[in-house]
Each structure stands twice: as structure tokens, then as C-alpha cells.
């Protein structure tokens, strides 16, 4: 992750804009869960149509802001990654043309170049930048439904460990995707079951709106943890490939 931070802050003005955009995206991402919470707990009890319309318009505006800032951030990330890694890829191509290589050496360098190209897309950097705000979802969960926060934290750890150990566990990509869907569904069942029990059996302030809203937040947090773990592994592969290519370029 040090290399990621180093690359990010090569252009401090762009890094600042990316962090600000990520903060706004994180705030706007709270809209669906807060909308569900307020509609179920406030509108259904009051029945005032103008309140529902105002809430719906507000939520749509926030989602539109999130989409716009994600698009803008993706463009900035692509420009930054191209500025950093395109010279390395160009230097590799030039060096390969000027050097006699065995078939195995050529394949290894070609694979390293493909790793760099694949790991420089905007999604990977965006997933890393979103991680602090995924933790913000957990903090919000603590205030809404603390049991959902605990359950989500456990599933996030499981998801991140499985993603990090995917190669050691010999999991294929399809199996990993199926496992992610299974964990997402299992977490929803656990959160709703525990929440329903608390509403009916315990003397607590948890409401149906808070329960459903907290489940949406927990799902976003789990997705964010999964994406962060994948991005972290991609960054590690990119660093190894970059080191391999630079070593080859500098070889006399």
C-alpha cells in the first residue's frame, strides 16, 4: 500500500481532488439506506405525501451526485495512472524490440505488462479510495443497529480473508463469485433474523425502518470490503510486475 500512496501523491492537486470526490461519494452513498429508514419510520406513520415526494427527490439528487462524482473520479484516476505507468509500458516495448529474448522471457514480460495494464484501471484505485468510507458505513451502523455492525464486521473479515487466500485455497474465479453471493445472502438472513428478534422480544428502540436500512448499509460495507481486498491483491501483483519490468529495462 505504500506504493499506492506514493503513486497517488505524485500529483498532490489530483490526489486532493480524488480524496474530496471520494468523501462526497461516501456521503451520497448513504442515501438509499437513510431514505428507507425515514420513509418506513416517518412517512408511513404520518402519511403526508409531500414528505414522501421531498424525500424521494432528495435521495435521487444524492444518487445523481454520487454517479457524477464517480464518473469524474474515474476520469481523473485514468489520467493519473496513464501518466505514471504508460512510460513504463512504452519503455518495455522499446526494450523488447532492441533485445533478443527467449520464448519464456518474452512470455513473462508480456504477462507482467498485461498485469500493469489491468491493474491501472480506475476501478481498482477507486475501490482503495472508497475503503475509509466503507468504515464510515460501519460507524453509521453502530448508531442505527449495533448488532448489524458487529455481524457486518465479522462477514467483512471473512470475505477479506477468503479473497486474500483465494490462491492458497485453490478457489477458481467462478467459485469465488458464488461464495461472495452466498456470504452476502447469509449476512442478510442473519441481520434480519437477529433484528426481528430484537424488535419483538427485546426492550430496544430498533424499528423496522432501522432494521432494513441497516441491512442495506451492511451490504454496502461488505461489498466495499470485498472490493478493497481484491484491489489490494491487484496492487501487490502490479508492484511485482513493475519491479520485474524496471529490472529488465535497466539491464544492460
What are these regions (language model features)?
Residues 1-31, 45, 49-54, 73, ...:
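Membrane-integrated ABC transporters
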Residues 15-72, 143, 147, 193, ...:
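Transmembrane helix-loop-helix hairpins at lipid-water interfaces of multipass membrane proteins
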Residues 105, 120, 175-178, 207-213, ...:
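DHp/HisKA histidine-phosphotransfer helix
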Residues 1, 78-118, 167-169, 239-250:
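Extended non-transmembrane interhelical loops and adjacent amphipathic helices
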Residues 221-248:
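Cytosolic ends of transmembrane helices, especially the final helix of ABC transmembrane type-1 domains
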Residues 22-30, 63-67, 83, 95, ...:
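Residue-level hotspots within the lipid-embedded alpha helices of multi-pass solute transporters
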Amino acid at each position: 500500500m505504500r506504493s499506492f500512496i506514493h503513486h497517488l501523491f505524485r500529483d498532490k492537486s489530483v490526489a486532493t481532488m480524488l480524496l474530496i470526490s471520494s468523501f462526497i461519494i461516501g456521503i451520497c452513498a448513504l442515501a438509499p439506506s437513510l431514505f428507507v429508514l425515514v420513509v418506513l419510520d416517518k412517512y408511513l406513520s404520518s402519511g403526508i405525501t409531500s414528505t414522501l415526494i421531498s424525500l424521494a427527490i432528495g435521495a435521487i439528487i444524492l444518487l445523481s451526485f454520487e454517479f457524477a462524482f464517480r464518473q469524474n473520479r474515474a476520469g481523473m484516476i485514468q489520467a493519473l495512472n496513464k501518466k505514471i505507468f504508460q512510460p513504463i509500458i512504452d519503455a518495455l516495448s522499446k526494450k523488447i524490440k532492441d533485445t533478443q529474448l527467449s520464448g519464456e522471457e518474452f512470455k513473462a514480460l508480456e504477462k507482467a505488462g498485461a498485469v500493469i495494464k489491468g491493474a491501472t484501471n480506475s476501478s481498482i484505485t477507486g475501490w482503495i479510495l472508497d475503503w475509509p468510507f466503507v468504515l464510515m458505513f460501519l460507524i453509521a451502523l453502530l448508531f442505527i443497529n449495533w448488532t448489524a455492525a458487529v455481524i457486518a464486521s465479522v462477514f467483512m473479515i471473512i470475505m477479506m480473508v477468503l479473497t486474500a487466500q483465494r490462491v492458497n485455497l485453490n478457489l477458481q474465479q467462478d467459485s469465488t463469485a458464488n461464495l461472495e453471493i452466498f456470504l452476502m445472502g447469509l449476512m442478510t438472513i442473519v441481520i434480519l433474523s437477529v433484528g426481528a428478534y430484537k424488535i419483538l422480544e427485546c426492550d430496544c428502540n430498533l424499528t423496522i425502518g432501522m432494521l432494513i436500512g441497516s441491512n442495506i448499509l451492511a451490504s454496502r460495507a461488505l461489498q466495499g470490503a470485498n472490493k478493497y481486498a481484491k484491489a489490494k491483491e491487484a496492487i501487490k501483483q502490479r508492484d511485482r510486475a513493475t519491479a520485474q519490468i524496471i529490472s529488465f529495462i535497466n539491464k544492460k
